Amino acid sequence: MRTHDIPRSPLVGHKKNAAPDGIGASRACCPARENEPFKKGSTNSRGGGVEWSRSSTRRVRGSALERGMKQLKWWAVGPVLGICAGVWGAAHPVHADPWDTTAAGRSTIRLSAMGAVPLFQVDWCNSGRGDDRNANAQTNGHKYIYPAFSAALGFEHFVCRGLSLGIDASVQYHCSYPNNTYSPTTPYYYLAIPVALTAGYTVAFWRIRLPLTVGAGFNYQHYYTSTYYGLVLKAAAGCYFQLTEHWSLGVSATYSGVPRSCEKIIEEDRQQTNTRTAQFIAAGVDVRYHL
C-alpha cells in the first residue's frame, strides 16, 4: 500500500483545531464556552467553586431600576390622566339611558326652598355694644337671631358614575331684635350669601337618588353695621324621587359652618377682634332638572 493511500486522521495537519487531553479539549471543541459567564450553581473550570455571574447581577439591578422608574412615571402621570379623562368625559358625554341620571357626562340643576335655623343665640359680634357701654352685659349684650327663609341654587356635573363636582349658592335672611337700651324695638337683620364648590356621590337604585355632598367656599355676611367676608364649610344630604327622565323631586338638609366669623370686623369705623363660629342647619324641598 502506498503512503498516500493510508487514511489520515482528521486532526493531522490541523493542530490549531486539535483538542488536547483534559479540560483544554472541551475548550478547544467549544471555544464559545471559554468566555461564557458562570451561572449560579456552575463550577469554575480553572479552580472550581460556585460564583454569581456579574452580568446576571447587572441585569437584575437594571430590571429593578426600570420597574422603579415605570412606577414613578405612573404615579406622576396617573392624576393628570384622571383629570384629562374627566374633561374629556365632560366634553363628550356618553349616551346612556335617559333615566340613568348619575352616569358620566350627565348634569343636574337644583332649586331649593328651605328654612334655616341658627345654632347660636348669644352675643353675635357685640354689634349692639352692650358689653362695651353698659355694665349689665346680661341685658344689653345678647342678640337673638331667629329662624328664617333660605333659597339655594346648585349645579353639578358627573365626571364618572355617581361622582359629581359642582357649585352651590344660597341666600339666608334672618331677623333679629337685640335686647339693648338704645333701640329695644328696632329690628336688625342678618344676611348671608355663601357660595361653595362641592363634591358629591349619589347612590341610585330604581327611581331613588341619595346624594351626599361636601363643599367649601366664600361667604358674605352682614349684621347691623358689621360686614364680614370669610370661609364657609358645608355638608348636605338628600333623598329624591325620579318623576320623569328630566325631573326629580325630593327633600334635603344642609349644615353650614362659618369659622371665626367675626374676626377683624369693621363696625362704625372701629375694629373689633371678637370671634365666633356661626353654624346653621337648613332643610327644605328641592326640585331638580337633569340635563
Curated annotation (Swiss-Prot):
It is found in: Cell membrane. Its main location: membrane. The chain crosses the membrane at residues 74-96, 188-210. It comes from the Bacteria. Residues 1-55 are annotated as: Disordered. It is a multi-pass membrane protein. One of its GO terms (cellular component) is plasma membrane. Keywords: Cell membrane, Membrane, Transmembrane, Transmembrane helix. To T.pallidum TP_0733. This is Uncharacterized protein TP_0126. The lineage of its organism: Bacteria, Pseudomonadati, Spirochaetota, Spirochaetia, Spirochaetales.
